[in-house]
Amino acid sequence: MRIMLLGAPGAGKGTQAQFIMEKYGVPQISTGDMLRAAVKAGTPLGLEAKKVMDAGQLVSDELIIGLVKERVAQDDCAAGFLLDGFPRTIPQADAMASSGIALDHVIEIDVPDEEIVKRMSGRRVHPGSGRVYHIVFNQPKVEGKDDVTGEDLAIRPDDEESTVRKRLDIYHEQTKPLVEYYGAVAAKGDVTYNKFDGTQSVATVSDEIVAVLS
């Protein structure tokens, strides 16, 4: 069961990824984790990646594909894997396909931009403990204060509305074209493509995903 998750930042992919991993016992493949592990292990690709990163440059698609290929060949991926956050672009998807990494299911979690902005820009964090609140969905007992310590809550830079909108712009420009790309692959019968309404409850989305994967 080789699964890829698609959706904008804040659409709830992380929550569903966790659910799929636990339900089906497949590992999540994150390119960030892979890079760190390869660098730590000192593999040839890891050393190459370290050189590039130490120079402050972006790791090339070829290098990332090489790491993904190495990773999916490991024993824990025998029953499948879950890709989240990769591929991000059509060239990456093409390179992945031509290197023989096939997918069975593409799952898109769809949430309108304004809902994502509401979700993410409403988050408030207690810096000392990492406790997370939300001005709409999970309010603190006293506005702007941590329930336990009474200290001030803060907005993470990542959750500032302008930052959220910037990330959404990048998603629409680079990653959203993959929706059409994998739609075309699915039309040829090479993969199943399913789109879920991410504004529903977490449990509802999980149930719908299970119905498709079973």
UniProtKB/Swiss-Prot annotation:
Protein name according to UniProt: Adenylate kinase
Pfam families tied to this protein: ADK, ADK_lid
Enzyme Commission number(s) from the entry: 2.7.4.3
Annotated coiled-coil segments of the chain: none
HAMAP family: Adenylate_kinase_Adk
The protein's enzyme class: transferase
Signal peptide: none
Record bears the keyword Transferase: yes
Residues the entry annotates as binding AMP: 31, 36, 57-59, 85-88, 92, 156, 167
Keyword Nucleotide-binding: yes
GO biological process: AMP salvage
InterPro entries assigned: Adenyl_kin_sub, Adenylat/UMP-CMP_kin, Adenylat_kinase_CS, Adenylate_kinase_lid-dom, P-loop_NTPase
Region listing for LID, in residue ranges: 122-159
CDD domains for this protein: ADK
Pathway field: Purine metabolism; AMP biosynthesis via salvage pathway; AMP from ADP: step 1/1
